[in-house]
Amino acid sequence: MSKLKDTLKKLWRNEPKNLGNLHQDKTGILKHREWRGISDTAYDYYRWLITWKDIIVMAGKAPVSTVKGLMSYRWMASYLSAPAWVDRHTEGLRGPQLRITHLHMNGLVKPTTDIINFLLANDKHFHKNSKWSDRTVNVDEIFSSEIMAGFPNLKDNHVSTIPIFLTSMVDQQITPPYLDITEGYGVPADVCPLPSAEAGVAINDDYPMVGKCAITCNMPCDGSVMNSAYIDRRFNIPTHVLNVPLRYNGEDVQPYAVDEVKSMIEFIEEQTGEKFDWNAFFAAMENYNEQLEYEIQKWEINKTDYPQMTGATFWLYRLFYFHISGGMDERFLKIDKKVNKLMLDAYKKQTKCSKEMRHRAIVWSCPANYYTSLANWLENCWGVNVVMDMETMISYIQYDTSDKEKALETYAKTLQRTTMRKHTKGGYANVVDELWRIVDEYNADMVIMYDQISCKGMDGLVGIFDDQARERGISFIWVPQDLMDPRTISRRDMRENINKYMTTVLQEEPVDPTLVDFDDTMAW
């Protein structure tokens, strides 16, 4: 009888195995969908259909503009591989973890299709008299959108997000052509690939022409500052520079930071004729605060012995809604309510988040855009659960929704703590001491440290990290990567660095040997 029960249980929901055999060599295309048991296979297939539905609906809303976009912009076709991108982040998942990840991923896919639709429908390349183009404010991709909640009659456009920043996560092959364009224009090849690729999009005229005016800033680094000149010349619209303090921990810089925010608001008002609406702003910040409470609840669960959100979708979802939503898009709040209910139910049942939970890891430094699913591979291949990462722990300061001056102070501090900035600016304490604080809080025994070879940010700290990790008895794995250029260091190279550490230093056997080594150089 017990044997029959066990058979039926596995038929309903099985454990992942031999995941490496699912994919074709080099291209990484699935030979067939993963069999997860009746329950999870049916749910996974249902969500796969939802992803395609969102893409088809996007095309149906503006079919002519969509076709023009496919014909005009190199990056546009990459989004057709979005279902495969979702598959990479759900591989090996079962039960609540599968459902949580799909909800998070749809929180990226659906809003992205809406943004693409908006850009193409109002692109002056295709529509000279666009209604919304002159009611749009262009901003940098790591700009935090809360301030636009005060302009309910305007929209913001994160200029580089759709054409290159998010696209490079979906399709690793899209960035190299733009990097080559920039280098052919005379820019050195050792520049960080992020601003270099963004400049390539501008040089190739692959940005949708939308926007009345633009806000640019000095984030996250000097490469991005230089890239702003290329984008400014391509759009040729009035541009305001928002300067964000680098040494941001001290309160002495905050009056200056608030003055910069006020100056930006005045610029938007002058260029668009709109006045800042405090009531609309505070209403959106109420949503922002509520969503932040859900976010912190996720973090608290991951500190326990039964974390429920591991892998990469944790930071991908956080990164996306943090910059895009600004408290204005209530869809994210609905997703968080569903996700947190699933999470708490699974936690109460002490559900394991993966087949084997051998190590609790913190991911530090900027991840490679071309390999966002590395954390999923770590979990499936080596039983390494990523319980927290640097890009998730960006600003989590709540807004005062009654005091205007305090609200502006919070926004200024939020800008100082955005993606690729909070822990890489402001001094030693923000990157080194903060790492060990998080390691202790999350009871981690391992750190995955990305070594972005085109960035000088971590270069001076290599020895310090290694020495302090050794003192604490923490397994510290350096993973070289080139952010957006898979030609320099491939996904396979990244995995090989981890494999060597796991087999030689820790002398462990893989959870799934079929995932140890495979070639995916031609994959999306």
Regions found by a protein language model. Give the residues of each.
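Cap/lid and interdomain-hinge subdomains that line or gate substrate/regulatory clefts
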Residues: 229-311, 506-524
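A charged, amphipathic alpha-helical module
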Residues: 2, 11-138, 262, 266-397, ...
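Redox- and metal-dependent alpha/beta enzyme cores, enriched for Fe-S-associated oxidoreductases
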Residues: 132-133, 141-180, 365-436, 440
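An N-terminal, globular interaction/scaffold subdomain
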Residues: 100-204
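Active-site and donor-binding regions of nucleotide-sugar-utilizing enzymes
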Residues: 163-254, 478-480
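Structural motif
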Residues: 138-143, 216-220, 363-368, 451-452
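Hydrophobic alpha/beta core scaffold segments
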Residues: 142, 372, 376-388, 403-414, ...
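Extended, charge-rich low-complexity interaction segments
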Residues: 193-205, 266-286, 413-436, 440, ...
